[in-house]
């Protein structure tokens, strides 16, 4: 019997609390969003591009300038410190068809010499395979 009384009391208090919650929710202002009005556009790309080096192909889609930052200052600095990273970047340079002469104006002498060594080693590995 006491269990029934406790359960009834619990349900009654739960209903009272939920009614109070609903009353406080009704006072909340709802602001309209301009994003919903333009649902068909991509929000992050809806701005106009001005000076970026991005080409638009014949389908109207962006094409990134591949290899445009191969010789950025941060990459060159990291290559001087981290030999594993340097080897990965050397492989990228090689994949883009850059010779030692191509990279010379962009890199310090130490990296130019290291790249020449890298290419010689890769050549020997390919010959021996």
UniProtKB/Swiss-Prot annotation:
Chain location of the short sequence motif RxLR-dEER per the record: 42-64
TM helices/strands, residue ranges: none
GO CC, alphabetical: extracellular region; host cell cytoplasm; host cell plasma membrane; membrane
Cross-referenced InterPro entries: RXLR (IPR031825)
Record's keyword terms, sorted: Host cell membrane, Host cytoplasm, Host membrane, Membrane, Secreted, Signal
Signal peptide positions on this chain: 1-16
Pfam families noted in UniProt: RXLR
Subcellular location(s) of the protein: Secreted; Host cytoplasm; Host cell membrane
Keyword Lipid biosynthesis: no
Free-text function comment from the UniProt entry: Effector that suppresses flg22-induced post-translational MAP kinase activation in tomato but not in Arabidopsis. The perception of highly conserved pathogen- or microbe-associated molecular patterns (PAMPs/MAMPs), such as flg22, triggers converging signaling pathways recruiting MAP kinase cascades and inducing transcriptional re-programming, yielding a generic antimicrobial response.
Membership in a protein family: Belongs to the RxLR effector family.
Domain comment in the entry: The RxLR-dEER motif acts to carry the protein into the host cell cytoplasm through binding to cell surface phosphatidylinositol-3-phosphate.
Protein name stated in the entry: RxLR effector protein SFI6
Species whose genome carries this gene: Phytophthora infestans (strain T30-4) (Potato late blight agent)
Lineage: Eukaryota, Sar, Stramenopiles, Oomycota, Peronosporales
């Amino acid at each position: 019997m006491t269990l029934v009384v406790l359960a009834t009391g619990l349900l009654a208090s739960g209903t009272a609390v939920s009614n109070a919650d609903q009353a406080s929710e009704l006072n909340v202002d709802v602001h309209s969003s301009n994003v919903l009005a333009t649902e068909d556009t991509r929000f992050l790309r809806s701005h106009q591009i001005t000076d970026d080096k991005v080409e638009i192909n014949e389908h109207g889609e962006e094409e990134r300038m591949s290899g445009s930052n191969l010789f950025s200052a941060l990459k060159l600095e990291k290559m001087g410190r981290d030999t594993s990273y340097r080897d990965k970047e050397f492989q990228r340079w090689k994949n883009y068809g850059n010779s030692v002469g191509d990279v010379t104006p962009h890199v310090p002498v130490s990296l130019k010499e290291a790249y020449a060594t890298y290419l010689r080693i890769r050549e020997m590995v390919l010959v021996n395979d």
